[in-house]
Swiss-Prot record:
PROSITE patterns: CYTF (PS51010)
Signal sequence range: 1-35
Protein source organism: Pisum sativum
Biological process (GO), any one: photosynthesis
Membrane topology according to the record: Single-pass membrane protein
Gene3D superfamilies: 2.40.50.100, Cytochrome f large domain, Single helix bin
Family per record: Belongs to the cytochrome f family.
Pfam families: Apocytochr_F_C, Apocytochr_F_N
Main subcellular location: plastid
Residues binding heme, per UniProt: Y36, C56, C59, H60
Protein name, per record: Cytochrome f
Keyword field contains Plastid: yes
């Protein structure tokens, strides 16, 4: 009996260990591109604050342009393109987490009106599929299908991102109406300056934490510096740690002031946000407009014909 219980316990432990190892494998093997949008998704219920500011700006501090292009109007239950452009100088390199230089990535968040959502694959035309390429979009929340995120993806290939959007049909969704709706977009290029926990990344300027004289600068084996400053007020020593990446601007023996930049600003990226408007057009209204225009054209034609007929009658009476 004890042997059977021991065997059962060993079997359970092996099963549990395999499950844990499998979970670790899945987590560690997950593409890094899936991790970045989670920073905002985990910290904010809605990516757009009440002030209109998109929360990505809390980590990407530099202000850069972004542009969105959508049709002026769309019909219900149709697929259309929302094109987001994130321009930047393709020649520049950014500081990576290990201090080395690398290419910039881009990412975007698109906030659609309620009812609008990502178009399903079977509704996409070959032209749209070609524009999308290998991009993988995801909803900000399972319950918020109208908010889409993408990135980071290589900026050189995807500085222009095409979102395939499916418009809602008021006939099947009672909370959707034929109106003009706003859309909001945020786009970033490059790494952020602040991590979600509030700590700084190495994509920042490092400032002096004391006024005094630089006593010693030690270059670390894995990159970065350790700067010893002799405080001018009490002679104590203050050590500032510089992460790998930024270029050092000070030297030993140099007098510095509190908050003086010790390094250059390595950031070459930034975040921008914009908006656009789109009209969900009623097909009956379009048909009515076409009929109205057709009736006007027909009336004009009849008027011209009537005028010519009247002129012929007048001419015949004069000849008589």
């Amino acid at each position: 009996m004890q042997t059977r219980n021991a065997f059962s316990w060993i079997k359970k432990e092996i099963t549990r260990s395999i499950s844990v190892l499998l979970m670790i494998y899945i987590i560690t093997r997950a593409p890094i591109s899936n991790a970045y949008p989670i920073f905002a998704q985990q910290g904010y219920e809605n990516p757009r604050e009440a002030t209109g500011r998109i929360v990505c700006a809390n980590c990407h501090l530099a202000n850069k342009p972004v542009d969105i292009e959508v049709p002026q109007a769309v019909l219900p239950d149709t697929v259309f393109e929302a094109v987001v452009r994130i321009p930047y100088d393709m020649q520049v390199k950014q500081v990576l987490a290990n201090g080395k230089k690398g290419a910039l990535n881009v990412g975007a968040v698109l906030i659609l009106p309620e009812g609008f959502e990502l178009a399903p694959p079977h509704r996409l035309s070959p032209q749209i599929k070609e524009k999308i390429g290998n991009l993988s979009f995801q909803s900000y929340r399972p319950t918020k299908k109208n908010i889409l995120v993408i990135g980071p993806v290589p900026g050189k290939k995807y500085s222009e991102i095409t979102f395939p959007i499916l418009s809602p049909d008021p006939a099947t969704k009672r909370d959707v109406y034929f109106l003009k709706y706003p859309l909001y977009v945020g786009g970033n290029r490059g790494r952020g300056q602040i991590y979600p926990d509030g700590s700084k990344s190495n994509n920042n300027v490092s400032n002096a934490t004391a006024t005094g004289v630089v006593k010693q600068i030690i270059r670390k084996e894995k990159g970065g510096y350790e700067i010893t400053i002799v405080d001018a007020s009490d002679g104590s020593e203050v050590i500032d740690i510089i992460p790998p990446g930024p270029e050092l601007l000070v030297s030993e023996g140099e007098s510095i002031k509190l908050d003086q930049p010790l390094t250059s600003n390595p950031n070459v990226g930034g975040f921008g946000q914009g908006d656009a408007e789109i009209v969900l057009q009623d097909p009956l209204r379009v048909q009515g407009l076409l009929l109205f225009l057709a009736s006007i054209i027909l009336a004009q034609i009849l008027l011209v014909l009537k005028k010519k007929q009247f002129e012929k009658v007048q001419l015949s009476e004069m000849n008589f």
